[in-house]
Amino acid sequence: MFLIYIVNNFLYYVFKTIIINLGAIMKKILYIEASPRKDRSHSINVTKKYIEKINKNNDFDVKKIDLWNYDLPEFDGDMLNAKYAVIAGSEASAEENNAWAKVIEIFNEFQDADHYIFSVPMWNFSIPYKLKHYIDIVTQPGLSWSYSPEDGYSGLMTGKEATIIYASGDGYGEGTGFESYDLQKPYI
């Protein structure tokens, strides 16, 4: 009960601060839900409250992707060959192009948002594999990043921001002695 009280007071302050800044900069929000626990998930419950607060006096279009009920394509041979064809600037086969079309579809849905909200539980000190899979899908050459020998790596999705709501079963912050176990926040 004590922990929930502190979290609710803290969240009120955070929500109040964020709401002031968000109204003018975004209209389309993509909410990526990474926990299969649904109503038993702390990350989902906090995220629902957050979305409710920011949407109270705004007219945001919030689209939710539940990664546990979302068709993520496998990175199989055709998909990988298509990716490397993009990197090399070479032609891909028909099968590879079909595999790559699903990546483009998911990426376009991702890119279409003005702001992202990630609800991220800690699993085995890291993130759920479904979230890693989704990140692997949307982080592609020629879509979200580019590379040149002169400039190195460059991001192609500028002017976008994200809100990340983390949950874990214990504290891993600075001064706890458990900082090195936290692979969740550094990864995201």
Residue ranges and their predicted role:
Residues N8-Y12, N21-Y129, H133, Q140:
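N-terminal beta1-alpha1-beta2 submodule of the flavodoxin-like/Rossmannoid cofactor-binding fold
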Residues K102-I106, Y129-K130, D136-I188:
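FMN-binding flavodoxin-like domain, especially the glycine-rich phosphate-binding loop
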